[in-house]
Amino acid sequence: MKPVRLPAAATLALPRWGLVALCLLYILPGILRRDPWKTDDAAGFGIMWTMAHGSLADWLSPNIVGLAMPNEAPLAFWVGALLIKLFGWLLTDAVAARISTLVFFAIGAAAVWRTAFVLGRRNEAQPLKLAFGGQPAAIDYGRTLADGALLIYLACLGLLLRSHETATPALHVSLVAAAFYAGACLFDKPNVRSAAGLGASIGLLVLARGWTVPLALSIAMLALAIIRYRDSLRQLLSVAVPIALTIPLLWLLALRTLLPGSEVADAWLAANLKLLSTPKLFTLSFLAKTLVWYSWPAWPIAAWAVWAWRAQATLHVALTVSGILALILLSLVTNSPKDHELLALLPPMAILATFGLPTLKRGAINAIDWFSVMTLSAIAGFIWLGWIAKQTGWPPKLAGNVFKLAPGFQPEFNVFALIIALATSVGWLLLLRWRLGRRPSVLWRAVVLSTGGLVLCWLLLMTLWLPWLNYAQSYASVAGEMRQHLPADYRCVDTNDLGSAQRASFAYLGELRFSRPGDAPCDLLLVQDDGLRKRGAQMKKIEGDLTLLWQGRRPADRHEFYRLYQRNAR
């Protein structure tokens, strides 16, 4: 027997404008008024910027001003570079590149919604018919489940930061969602169009990140077709597989043909192969500890959905669970896993979790609600208190800690940002009043506070705290200081142990002309170390007669030191 029994009143869908507004509130903050931030955001922007201002070789082989990035595939950077070409003159290159995150997010959000809708309107997913009628229509039920899936997807903590970075993870997770949408359409009604969409999604995934995740998803889809949905196997093998193979092969062929002698293709394939290893206890421990918070609140509701639907042979469980299992197994054999590699799990978890919403007990719904209310309201309150301390100096201890983390930071007051923060906070209070006061019966009531609270906290950070975050996470200050000490007639800059994010930031913000492979030794040398402990070892690597022109570091970072030398002519 199906585990769902509910009236039509529970399937009230969110208005389209409301969903669109929520998505815009989620993704737009952070696009404007900030520089590329350290680590992946700056490195990803550096590749886009290099492509936009470089040659055909830069477009085919991802690099940061000559620094090869063999573990990166080019698709996300092509999109960012194209946007820089189109809008960089108007918005600045950094903002234009960041529009790519908006495009990627839109693809992922739409794919999650559509997948849940396709699966939710199937007969096997429909609730039991009531004795005297009044059950929801199939389309209405599917739309409500789709709204719930999107809310759960947006509420996942792991998605928040990565979806705002100009790097491959933002596109990667969206293409995973697109692959599940195409797979749902194919298994629902086998046809060539859906198979082509699945093949294109898998092929583009390879161009976005590498072949490990696409391979895992392909195995899951093929296994599902062989075991349960054999009527889709022919389209899968004859259409999806050839398209999935052709797309990355075109890029590899272009590398071989247009860049003869280049080792980019071999280096990329080798870098992907190095991602895999035998299962280790550390990997299992990392997965268990990270996934608990990374996929909250999707994972507990998804686990409940599997239990609630355990007696039913349904596509919405088979498709998502097979994908989740394949991706978890891949994570277990991943060498030195990182948190962003778990992003691929979020779309299938969110889609599966929405089918658990109609079966949740009142106690579970209340527990999720109160956890969201207490936790996210406390975080929002602390953000406000920290901002007050930053602006006024009270409470003094908190203000001291704020400035200790960002020495030299000068607070600024922005009326427009304050108005947005106040309006968002009032909106949160109204949402609490609606959810806790009226006690609505709609399916997505269990996750609306989780999503709304997360959006609130992100908006507060991107309005009240953006200047501080920009100061603490950007290389703008040290790049500007270094630029003032560059000789007017210098030719180029060699580097020693300079990180990829730093290279990208100094090239863009500091306008440094870095050397490229094959260039003669430059007249300047930029060295990065972590202080006195390694300075002696660094000096042994440096050859020639050098004059120190400048040394410094980011005020907010005690472990990154930079020294700029000029090579003396012999």
Describe these PLM feature segments.
Residues G158, H172-D188, M349-L352:
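Specific aromatic-rich, kink-prone transmembrane helix
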Residues G158-L171, G210-W211:
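Short acidic/glycine- and proline-prone juxtamembrane loop motifs at membrane-interface regions
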Residues A421-W434, V442-R567:
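Short periplasmic/luminal acceptor-recognition loop of GT-C membrane glycosyltransferases, typified by
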Residues T144, A179-G197, I202-L205, W309-R310, ...:
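Membrane-interface transmembrane helices that cradle and orient dolichyl/undecaprenyl
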Residues Y26, G44-A68, L75, L82-K85:
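Extracytosolic helix-loop segments that constitute the early lumenal/periplasmic catalytic or substrate-binding loops
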Residues M1-L28, R143, V239-I243:
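Start-transfer (signal-anchor) and selected internal transmembrane alpha helices
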Residues G44-G54, A200-H340, P348-I351, I368-F416:
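Transmembrane-lumen/periplasm boundary regions of multi-pass, lipid-linked membrane glycan transferases
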Residues I99-A137, A155, A178:
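Transmembrane-helix motifs of polytopic, lipid-linked glycan transferases
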